A protein has these predicted regions:
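Lipid interaction determinants
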Residues: 19-142
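Bacterial Sec-dependent N-terminal signal peptides
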Residues: 1-30
Length: 142
């Protein structure tokens, strides 16, 4: 009988131990700060084909977004509703440099136009999604 209780206690400890507090997919995300753009449209970005590493940064209290699309700097307005995990971008502007590799730049800027929401993708990642829930951009903490 004592053996049964010991086994039950071990099983319970293992079960409770698996309920860790690490971030899981779908949890609330604080967008504030700078992020690396690691995927666009579900495809990994090859940074050898960009002049600079693509990034996005957010200051949600100021409704501000900034970063780099791979060549040009990005600035604009980002309206974030953290409770609903929705986001909209307005007045996105870029510098006007011409770089050898511009393919990701165009894809990133087009993706920003269709972003409506965001969600945790686990492991320090966040996905910016369109109205259908498709990941348009995947961001990784810096």
């Amino acid at each position: 009988m004592k053996l049964k209780y010991n086994i039950l206690a071990i099983v319970a400890a293992i079960a409770l131990g698996s309920c860790s507090s690490s971030k899981k997919v779908g949890e609330a995300v604080d967008l504030n700060g700078e992020w690396n753009i690691v995927e666009v449209g579900g495809t990994a970005i090859d940074t050898t084909k960009t002049e600079f590493s693509p990034t996005l940064g957010f200051e949600t209290a100021k409704n501000s977004v900034f970063g780099c699309a791979g060549c040009n700097s990005i600035n604009g307005i980002a309206r974030v509703n953290a409770a609903k995990q929705t986001i909209s971008f307005k007045e996105i502007g870029t510098t006007l440099m011409l770089c050898a590799h511009m393919e990701y730049e165009q894809q990133i800027l087009q993706a920003l136009e269709s972003v409506k929401a965001y969600k945790s993708a686990g492991e320090g990642r966040v996905q910016l999604t369109n109205g259908s829930g498709k990941a348009m951009l995947t961001l990784q903490t810096q």
